[in-house]
Structure formats: C-alpha cells, structure tokens
Amino acid sequence: MSSRGTVLEAERLVVGYAGAPVCGEMSVAVGAGEVLGVVGFNGAGKSTAARTLAGRQLPISGEVKVHGLLANPDAVAFRREVSAVFDEDLFFPSLTVREHLLLVARGHSLPDPEEQVEEELSFFGLQERADVVPESLSSGQRRRTLLAAGLMRPASLLILDEPEQRLDPVMREALGRRVRSLADGGATVVLVTHDPQLLLDTATSCLVIDDEVTLATPEVAAAIIAGA
C-alpha cells in the first residue's frame, strides 16, 4: 500500500448482471501512486469489474469507495473523483475532436485549456483529424480521442479498460509512459489489459479475474496473459 494513503477500496465486491455474478468475490485496496492491473481470459468479467469500480453500475453485493465516497452512478461527488475510459463511451455527434476536448478542459476548469488540448492532440497524433466529427474518424482515432479526454480529466482515480486496443506499438509504449507518469504524480490507476508489456511497464500489483479473484505480481499476471 502506498505511503500516500488508500484511494480505492473494494470490499467483498461481487459484480455481474441481473443478480448473476460473472466472477468471484474481490477485495482490494489501492493507494495513491499505484497502478492496479486487471487481467483474465475473455469473458472473465474484467470490464464488468472495471465499470463497477468506476461507479458505472451497481455491484450485486459489497461496496466500492474512492476517498471514502461510496460508488453510485448517481453520486456526483464520487464521479468527480473518477475518470474512466470504456470503448462504449459516446461522443456528441455534432462536435469535432477539438471541440470535444475543449469541452472536457473547460468543464473541468483546466488552466490554458486550448494549450492543453493541443498537447493532447499532438500526443495522440490527432492534429490532422482535430476538426472533423466522430463519424469521420477510424475506430483507432475514436479510441485515441476517448483516451485523450479521459487522461485530461483531473481525477484521483483513472480507470482504463483495455486502452491498448487499436493502438500501434509506438502509441502503446507512449501510453505506458503516460500512465506511469500520472501514477508518479499521485494518481491511482486501474488498468484492464491483455498486453503483457504494458502491464509490466506500469502495474504495481494485479488482480487476476476468474471464478476466484486473486492478487498477483505484475510478472505473474503478465505470464498468465502471455500464455492465454
């Protein structure tokens, strides 16, 4: 546990749909500056667990807290503490990439919002697509736009659900450095991934999701997904 204190706590958490669990019970505490990797086979329940940790859906039982605030889709104070990126996240169809990012920057009162947006466009290689609407983007470009928006938001907890999907190797490596830098700055990160190298580059501990949920070192977790 980080000496800077616990940020995310999940206590006897069971996740699933319509009362049916998708994986085993889990309990975990993650501190400031730590990166929790989440791994498991396809369909094991990783994304469901991540959505529950993000407060996007309610657990079947147990609880999730961030800085002591109980997770709930309707809890405004909780949502302010969390930035999450999921593949199903939506865009405003009439806004361009730049306009989306400016909306995030201004909505969170970031200093120099235009400058920060330009930095994100550059980091994710979106400068040439900055003034087009989402329907004109490739799936990879949409993914990078979602990541740019998620990483811009000031939050105690950042949750990334398979962020490596549709990213080339160079961008995956850059994303790993960015995640590590955010954690070094005090952010708590939950990283759902199938990428062993991204896990090794970023994670400080891991959850292995299956019928039973276990804690593992990044090295053990990376070996599990490399052999999947």
Where would I find each of the regions flagged by the language model?
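Conserved ABC ATPase "signature" region
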Residues: 102, 112-129
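H-loop/switch region of ABC-family ATPase nucleotide-binding domains
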Residues: 193-194
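Q-loop/switch helix immediately C-terminal to the Walker
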Residues: 95-107
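Helix-to-loop junction immediately C-terminal to a conserved catalytic motif
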Residues: 54
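Conserved ABC ATPase signature
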Residues: 133-137
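ABC ATPase C-loop
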Residues: 150-151
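Catalytic Walker B motif of ABC-type/P-loop ATPase nucleotide-binding domains
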Residues: 158-162
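Conserved ABC transporter NBD signature motif
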Residues: 62-70, 78
